Amino acid sequence: DLDVVIANNIDKLFTYKPGEWLTIRDFLRSQRPTWDRYNSSVIRFDSGQLDNMWQEFNNNQRDIQKRFRGDQDYIWDWAKKNKPATLFPDEWIRSWKWEVRSSKEWAPGGRPGNRTFKTIETVRPDKNCCITVFHGDPNPENCKDPFVVDNWR
């Protein structure tokens, strides 16, 4: 995904559980600990490993786009029926908005797609976190937190 900021070395994402396809638990996990849906911001798979998923999507695009709200819902549904993903450890990939920052308040006047936070925070992800994800608002380019400004390129 393009709305992520690399926080620390990402090598372990490529060496963890070789041969398995991996993704992350959706960030509602921070509000519902048993939430088992996927977030598609970070996925790792070997070439050809998910060809069946792609072929099903390619052959049924219109129907799939009508049935599912987005790619994450389709991927989760496909995986349930075919080959569930192995999950990266939650602490390796964090939601900037829900798991790194403390304040979630929006600045006044912003519209969805162009909002930013009301306050600037000097937080940074812990040493185990490789990637921070910006799902929904704000996008990294709209976030004024120093860590994001310094690392978003």
Predicted regions and their residues:
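Catalytic core and acceptor-binding pocket of nucleotide-sugar-dependent glycosyltransferases
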Residues: S47-R153
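Sequence-level detector for tyrosine residue identity
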Residues: Y16, F27, W35-Y38, W54, ...
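Short, surface-exposed beta-edge/turn micro-motifs
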Residues: G19, N39-S40, N128-C129
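A conserved catalytic-core signature of glycosyltransferases
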Residues: D1, Y38-S40, G70
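GT-A fold catalytic core of metal-dependent nucleotide-sugar glycosyltransferases
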Residues: D1-W35, R44-F45
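A short secondary-structure junction signal
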Residues: N8-D11, P33, Y38-S40, M53-N58, ...
